[in-house]
Amino acid sequence: MAGHASWVLAIRFVWLQACLAFMMSSFSRLAVSSKMLATFAWVALLSSCAMATSVAPPVKGNPQLKKDHYVSYDNEKFGYRKWLPKSTAHQDPAIVIIGVHGISGHAGDYDNLAHYLLKHRQDVALYAAETRGQGMDPKECRRGDVRRVEQWYKDLVVFTELVRQEHPKSKIVWFGESMGSLIVMHGYQNARREQRPHAMAISSPIIEVDSELPTWKLLAAKCAAILFPKARISLESLSDGRRPMVTKEDIHEQQAAKNPWYIRRYTLRLLVGLGDLAQSMDQMAPAVSCPVLVLHGGKDFFTQEDKVNDFCKSFNQSIDKTHHYYPGSYHLLMYDHQRVQIFSDISSWLNKMGDHQRSSK
């Protein structure tokens, strides 16, 4: 979970400062003129269209759900956690939540929510997988990087299908927190109709990196990611001395930096990819045809209330949409001081699932 307090800031600074500085410093060491730099940058941008159409041969994987890990579409293995009520010994739970954690987080971030649900009801199970490129990725060289954001969507769909096979009678709910909200929203858009969940919960969504960024700076940042996709940047070095509070007590971030899943440096392509996902969140909402729950704290440094309100309004008016706003809460709602109330609201929303049939278009 470490890095939540700085990853959005990092994307902003990558787009505003870091990428430009990285480009200029790299080329200055090579004594390249500014004219040549500009020419090379535009060539890279124009050629990116061709690069995007170059698709590697598909890998035929053998997806499987093992005791402590699952095998994804490309035979890569990722750990996961599950919290099952005792009732699953003789019947499928009514609802299975599939949680997607935030940046520099891990599957255990859903522990608080899971234990609340296990204590208060016996009809809900929760699964949460480790995200590719994050701190519990078994391949250390891949931590802090992702080749394409589409890999996240594919992993989510595969994991969901494997969980469905375990609980064929259960309704599936995707739950995305922070960066996870980007993955579930875009994953829904990219999934086939039969692969989509019955409902989605969006906690602390990241909506727009910065609407005031000049177009030329956005292009420069994307150019840097094309030229140096695997170059890594420390999030702390980009924070400009700012350390936003992510919970009321604000001790989680200090502790998280000591965790084994903490990532100190991220690649440019991952950060710019996240920025692109955040910028297009509003465009994803109209395609959603299942019930949606949106949770947001009034003291969330990264996304303002009006942005979340606009995001909620962009969903189709025909769907069941619930928006809970907590004026005194911060970004990490599942760790914050109002979490018991938030968990209670989530549980109440889940009660409505029995009134809905699976709806996906």
Tell what function each PLM region has.
Residues A44-K86:
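An N-terminal hydrophobic leader/cap segment in hydrolases
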Residues P93-G102:
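Short beta-strand element of the alpha/beta-hydrolase
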Residues I103-H115:
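The serine-hydrolase catalytic nucleophile loop
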Residues H106-A107, G135-S170:
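Catalytic nucleophile-loop/oxyanion-hole region of alpha/beta-hydrolase
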Residues L117-E140:
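Conserved alpha/beta-hydrolase
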Residues M179-T267:
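Alpha/beta-hydrolase-fold enzymes
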Residues V288, V294-H296, D300:
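Short beta-strand/loop motif that positions the catalytic acidic residue
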Residues P327-K361:
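Catalytic active-site module of serine/aspartate enzymes centered on a nucleophile-bearing elbow/loop
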